[in-house]
Amino acid sequence: MLVLTETSVGFVVFKLSSDAKIDNKDLWKEFETPEGANKALKVQAIQRFTSTASAVEDLTAVQDGRLTDSLSRFLLDTVGGADDGEKKKKKKKIEEMLVVSDPKLAGTINKALSIPVLSDSSTQDLYRGIRQQLASLLGGVDQKDLNTMSLGLGHSLSRFKLKFSTDKVDTMVIQAIALLDDLDKEINIYAMRVKEWYGWHFPEMAKIIVDNIAFARVVKAMGFRTNAVTTDFSLLLPEDLEATLKSAAELSMGTEISDSDMTHIHSLCDQVISISEYRTQLSEYLRNRMQAIAPNLTALVGELVGARLISHAGSLMNLAKHPASTVQILGAEKALFRALKTKHDTPKYGLIYHASLIGQAPQKLKGKMARMVATKAALSIRVDALSDADSRSDVSAAEVGISNRVKLESRLRALEHQAGIQSVRKVVSANGQQGRQQPRFEMSGVTGSYNAATDNVPLNGDLLPTQPATEEVKEEKDEKKDKKKKRKSEVAEAGDVTMDGDADLSMVAGETKEERRARKEAKKAAKAAKKAAEESGDGDKKSKKRRADEDEDSEKKKKKKKKDE
């Protein structure tokens, strides 16, 4: 049985003696001494590394489970077998089995060279003993020299792995964009605290200076508001704002604060200024990193949006594996699953919405623009992820992203022209200055007054709620009464209406009063006779029940008397 071992010297194949069996539980005892190790194993063949570069290349391939050309030739010469070109030819049967430490490499050797291999947990004690007595097994090699070679090869292998790590730059971008978001939150919190704190002393200043960083710099330079007249703000503010600030400081209605209060406010202003300066440096660092790792994506959607996409996907390679439809809604997963659950429309964009190409599109065309930008972004990401590092550092590295951006801008103008929509992009005048700028806030001091005349509600007929109803309503009621009387008189002229419980209404025409009275009396007599007959029958039933009840009561009374006696 042969044993393949990779060392810092090279690849070594040992011959395992017949006395030392690999399935023996006491195999480790054979390697307690150098003599026992040399008795159990003999060097069959050795292939030394020619240089450190070749050693790093071969060991990296072995760790990945790949078979290099040099190792393949060495095994064919030492063990035998057949390579891909000689598999069809007859070869002598290989009786020796090769022991390999890595199961993945063992499968590759068996498949490529048709060599029977063994790689399982039973070989661990064997390789542990080989590493322990390696210097004596190789013969003529000093242990110190072997340790030095192992250390140098380990350093070279580590540098090689770090150099070709595909995620190392991605990690820097992910951490940078996360820190940038945290700094924005911190600056906002500290700046709001400065405005609230200093607002007790100079409340009008918050409306005059809107920018947080400029506010902190002005507070740091001015101190108390009484120093505003003698302080030079030419390096911090324009002339009109400086004049407004000084005039407002003279008429301010803020309270007075102590020197210790101003000291703490100044220290907080220093924090705001220092964090903002570091944020500027971090933003420049992120821009340079994105230009180096993904120049085409940066040219298409910008460094911030590109960095957020990479951070959300985990790495540039993971982002390159996503289709354009996933890139389009990346970051809107919660809205997507909620829409699928409720069977509503799915979102049209996610993080890519903040790209300038989508932001300058009209609201009606944002969805279509997001789809086109995602398509071109997916192509740019794949170009950046799969291109060489040298080509990404070239001047023309962002050519794909720039050309796609130009195409998308022209396509957006064409869509706006077809839809008849005016462009919402920034208008630039002939002298290069931006048109339609937002006007600056000015404190006019004019307050609006309340118009009480708008509270009047006009009523019909100009009547107050307390006035009585009009004569038209009274006339309407009188007409209803007259109609009612008229209907009654018509009924009386036509004849009386008789009500019968068993029959419908009937009118007897030509009947005199005496006949009508006699008919009514006859009806009453018939009803009385019927009622008397019913009562007589019920009376007999009731009398029987009464007698039965009385008999029961008498019996109960007798029983009670007997018990009492």
From Swiss-Prot:
One GO term (biological process): rRNA processing
Keyword annotations from UniProtKB, A to Z: Nucleus, Ribonucleoprotein, Ribosome biogenesis, rRNA processing
Alphabetized SMART domains for the sequence: NOSIC
SUPFAM superfamilies: Nop domain
Chief site of localization: nucleus
Domain of life: Eukaryota
Keyword Nucleus attached: yes
InterPro entries in the cross-refs: Nop56/Nop58 (IPR045056), NOP58/56_N (IPR012974), Nop_C (IPR042239), Nop_dom (IPR002687), Nop_dom_sf (IPR036070), NOSIC (IPR012976)
Positions with biased composition (Basic residues): 519-530
GO function terms (MF aspect): snoRNA binding
Protein name stated in the entry: Nucleolar protein 58
Organism: Cryptococcus neoformans var. neoformans serotype D (strain B-3501A) (Filobasidiella neoformans)
